UniProtKB/Swiss-Prot annotation:
Family membership noted in the UniProt record: Belongs to the dUTPase family.
InterPro entries: dUTPase-like (IPR029054), dUTPase-like_sf (IPR036157), HSV_DUT (IPR034745)
Gene: DUT
Binding site for substrate: 280-282, 380-381
Cofactor: Mg(2+)
Lineage, uppermost ranks: Viruses, Duplodnaviria, Heunggongvirae, Peploviricota, Herviviricetes
Role of this protein: Involved in nucleotide metabolism: produces dUMP, the immediate precursor of thymidine nucleotides and decreases the intracellular concentration of dUTP to avoid uracil incorporation into viral DNA.
Claim: Coiled coil is one of the keywords in the record: no
Organism: Varicella-zoster virus (strain Oka vaccine) (HHV-3)
Protein name in the entry: Deoxyuridine 5'-triphosphate nucleotidohydrolase
Catalytic activity: dUTP + H2O = dUMP + diphosphate + H(+)
Enzyme class: hydrolase
Length: 396
């Protein structure tokens, strides 16, 4: 059973200035232990507790205990929504083999919960800054009542793959030239650029079946080879970055499906891994929403993208659009492990997810006792140089 622990000896040692002040806790002491530091001001706005609706292996639950008046001065427009970055006033330090998912949690069918949403987030083990959530809500929402905004910090145990990203296409030609692309049938009409890619059957050099038979077909060249589509990662990073292999054009409010020439075959002999695709925080904040989804074994890398920036945009070749997480199959998250999802803001049902058996360790001195981190407090795109990789083609 996972527990919330505050070690009085450790806290005293840190606060009285003996050896723990200049040393971190040995890694062996942090195995399957997630350090949490709750900022003092959190008590003014948020309740931070282990979820008592889960009998064992409890996720961390954050809930507003004061009403949240909207829109605030921090809100910005994102398509047909307002978006606001909410500081949750919590820091974390999981071991490198873990990550935290930030997910909206629902336990009752409250009517107003269909009017505001929390973008799914991935908290890397190396992130030491204050965790934030991205709140999207409809223009008519003026208040979120106490207890109606509930968020899980949900630990997942990661798996490593030596073959990703090196040999994921060992049975296919690694260079792709002719690729079929089509707009979705419900995309805005008269748009000059194709926005959805469906790849040819490379192994037989035959075109794949079009997704919509009434759609026009195009072909484009892909300048990147497969080894540049999925990037390597640092040990403290949760996911492998997924890059777009060509300039991607999205009209405002466009909802598209991306199919990349990567087949998940590296772990067909190792069914202990489930793969999931999530968006990147910098993209979600700008209004480019990658719908979180599973990546089933034996299938191409597919995911949906929703352009809520309010503008027509171009995402440049090589830009990091999404990330793939390899998660231990015993971890039951809010997404089905074998279904392609097109839901922009999926949420968890309270008490229905199964987290790994971790121990939560609450401390007031996380920066002193956590293992060193390369990323530190930099977040929301700090690992990217993305500011010039998205062109806004039409301003409103």
């Amino acid at each position: 059973m996972n527990e919330a622990v505050i070690d009085p000896i450790l806290e005293t040692a840190v606060n009285t200035g003996d050896m723990f002040c200049s040393q971190t806790i040995p890694n062996r002491c942090l195995k399957d232990t997630i350090l949490i530091e709750v900022q003092p001001e959190c008590a003014d706005t948020l309740q931070c507790v282990l979820d008592d609706k889960v009998s064992r292996h409890q996720p961390l639950l954050l809930r507003n205990h004061k009403k949240l008046e909207l829109p605030s001065e921090k809100s910005v427009t994102r398509g047909g929504f307002y978006m606001q970055q909410l500081e949750l006033l919590v820091k974390s330090a999981p071991p490198n083999e873990y990550a935290l998912l930030l997910i909206q949690c629902k336990d009752t069918a409250l009517a107003d919960e269909d009017n505001f949403f929390v973008a799914n987030g991935v908290i890397d083990a190396g992130y030491r800054g204050v965790i934030s959530a991205l709140l999207y809500y409809r223009p008519g929402v003026t208040v979120i009542l106490p207890g109606h905004l509930t968020i899980y910090l949900f630990p997942v145990k990661l798996r490593q793959s030596r073959l990703l990203p090196k040999n994921v296409l060992k049975h296919l030609d690694p260079i792709f030239k002719s690729i079929q692309v089509q707009p979705l049938s419900n995309s805005p009409s008269n748009y000059e650029k194709p926005v959805i890619s469906e790849f040819a059957d490379i192994s037989t050099v035959q075109q794949g079946q079009p997704l919509h038979r009434d759609s026009a077909e195009y072909h484009i060249d892909v300048p990147l080879t497969y080894k540049h589509i999925i990037n390597p990662k640092r040990q403290e990073d949760a996911g492998y970055d997924i890059c777009v292999p060509y300039n991607l054009y999205l009209k405002r409010n466009e909802f598209i499906k991306i199919v990349l020439p990567i087949i998940r075959d590296w772990d067909l002999q190792h069914p202990s891994i489930n793969a999931y695709i999530f968006g990147r925080s910098s993209k979600s904040r700008s209004g480019i929403i990658v719908c979180p989804t599973a990546w089933p074994a034996g299938e191409h890398c597919k995911f949906y993208v929703y352009n809520l920036t309010g503008d027509d945009i171009r995402i440049k070749t090589g830009d990091r659009l999404a990330q793939v997480l390899l998660i231990d199959h015993n971890t039951q998250i809010h997404l089905k492990h074998n279904v392609l999802s097109n839901i922009a803001f999926p949420y968890a049902i309270r008490g229905k997810c199964g987290i790994p058996g971790v121990q939560w360790y609450f401390t007031k001195t996380l920066d002193l006792i956590a293992t060193p981190s390369e990323r530190g407090t930099r977040g929301f795109g700090s690992t990217d140089k993305e500011t010039n990789d998205v062109d806004f083609l039409l301003k409103h």
